[in-house]
C-alpha cells in the first residue's frame, strides 16, 4: 500500500519552480532518507506532504487522502513531525512530559483538559525512547539533543503512520548526534512502527534501518530507490555533479568525500 503517492507534481511560488515534475511512491514498511544539499527543495517537499503547500500541477495522495478531495485535517493527525519549526513554538517553561503530551493534541500548548492517565502515557512514551531522565525537567533547561529526543517522543504520541525528521541532528555535537541516531533506529523496532522520512544533507547519518533513498537536487528527483541501488559511485557522482569517494563506516554506514 502506498502511503505517499506523487504523480507529475510541480510546485511554483511567485513564478519560481520549487519542485519540478516529481513522481514518487512510499510504501508501508519502507523508511526513506531524503538527501539533498541546501536549497534542493527538501523542506518544500516536506511542507507539501504535510499539506502546508499545495502543488501547482499533478496529483498528491497522502495516507489515502487525495489533495483537493479528502479530509486533510484528519490526514495531518496521522503524521508526526520533528523539526526546528516545531521546537520554536513550544513553551520554554513547560515540563518535559507535558511537552510530549502536546503531541496528542497536535498543538504547542495543552489547550484541553487532561488527566493523570494521559500524562502517564506521555511519561511512558518518553521512557520507551530512552528519555526517562528528562521527566520533571523544564524544556528550556534541556540541551539541544535532549530537546530533539523530547520532540521524537512528542511526535509518536498519536501513533502516527508517518514520522518526518527534518534535519533532526542540526546543532548537535558528535556524541549527541550518534545518540539521537540510535533513538531513531529504535523507532523502527516499536510495535506498529511508523514509516520514517529522514531529511538530511549528511550522508553519514543514513543508518542501517533506512531502506530507501531519494536524491533531490534543485527541486528535481535525480534518483530514488533501495539504498543499495543509490549508494554507488555512478549514481552519487551524477547527483553531486562531482567525483566522490564512498568510505564505509563499520559496514553499515558510509561517508561521502569529494575528490579534490
Swiss-Prot record:
InterPro entries named in the record: AAA+_ATPase, ABC_transporter-like_ATP-bd, ABC_transporter-like_CS, Metal_Ion_Import_ABC, P-loop_NTPase
Molecular-function annotations in GO: ATP binding; ATP hydrolysis activity
Lineage: superkingdom: Bacteria
Binding-site list for ATP: 36-43
Keyword match GTP-binding: no
Residue span(s) of domain ABC transporter: 4-243
Keywords, ordered alphabetically: ATP-binding, Nucleotide-binding, Transport
Coiled coil residues, start to end: none
Keyword Transport: yes
Similarity-based family: Belongs to the ABC transporter superfamily.
Name the UniProt record assigns to this protein: Putative ABC transporter ATP-binding protein
Gene that encodes the chain: abcX
